[in-house]
């Protein structure tokens, strides 16, 4: 499927529009990510300025840009399986954003799979912006591993009780039609980009999720991350 059609490219009807943009970056922080984690951090730090430039090139203005990070590992292995930041407003809080990223180190996780799906659930339940005439709610995910099925770690002492128990429940959250989970997230504004391996559940989500784009990698880990491609995909799509 054409990537811009999949994301919803409706041409130039929204030129000269102002957008409030929230981006949540779900980052695999397990030991196997050590060779690529610095590149992921570099992508995160440069993303806001590149995104503004890309939006300006399509005659769209970013009024407010916020970013949040969720670093995930494995509930059965790690004492801190999920590390979440607040939303940072950029560029004003660039220093705090960088400080949070600097504290993320590739460690733990054991063998795959990892608890990446829980990070998506946390992202969807975040305090997304609901101000402004036009909004984008963007999730970027970076992992070199398959995912633990939702709910499989429920027996772990530190596993939360307020998360979806299946891909179907997560999909309902993504589409904004969940009966059990509510947040400021708006499906119309939602965009997902995943740099993921060609494994469960990413192949399943690729077939079923709308407004989502997946860059599949081989089994040896993530390939180089093309930040320009991410920006191009997002700025060519409209709410």
Report the location of each language-model feature.
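Acidic, polar low-complexity linker/tail segments
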Residues: 1-24, 30-39
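C-terminal "exit" segments of structured domains
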Residues: 15-16, 210-239
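Solvent-exposed loop/turn segments at secondary-structure junctions
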Residues: 29-33, 74-77, 109, 144-149, ...
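Von Willebrand factor
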Residues: 77-79, 85-138, 147-148
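VWA/integrin I-like adhesion module and closely mimicked acidic/polar interface patches used
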Residues: 145-208
């Amino acid at each position: 499927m054409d990537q811009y059609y999949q994301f919803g490219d409706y041409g130039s009807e929204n030129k000269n529009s102002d957008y409030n943009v929230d981006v949540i970056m779900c980052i695999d922080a397990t030991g196997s990510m050590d060779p690529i984690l610095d590149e992921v951090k570099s992508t995160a730090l440069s993303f806001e300025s590149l995104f503004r430039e890309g939006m300006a090139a399509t005659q769209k203005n970013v009024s407010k840009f916020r970013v949040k990070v969720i670093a995930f590992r494995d509930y059965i292995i790690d004492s801190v399986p999920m590390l979440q930041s607040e939303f940072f407003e950029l560029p004003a809080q660039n220093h705090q954003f960088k400080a949070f990223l600097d504290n993320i180190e590739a460690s733990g996780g054991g063998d795959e799979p990892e608890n990446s799906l829980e990070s998506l659930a946390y992202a969807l339940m975040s305090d997304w912006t609901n101000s402004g005439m036009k909004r984008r709610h963007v999730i970027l995910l970076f992992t070199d591993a398959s995912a633990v099925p939702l709910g499989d770690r429920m027996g772990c002492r530190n596993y939360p009780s307020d998360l979806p128990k299946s891909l179907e429940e997560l999909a309902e959250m993504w589409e904004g039609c969940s009966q059990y989970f509510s947040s400021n997230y708006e499906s119309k504004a939602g965009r997902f980009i995943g740099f993921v391996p060609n494994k469960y559940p990413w192949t399943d989500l690729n077939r079923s999720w709308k407004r989502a784009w997946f860059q599949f990698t081989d089994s040896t880990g993530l390939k180089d991350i093309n930040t320009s491609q991410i920006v191009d995909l997002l700025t060519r799509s409209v709410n």
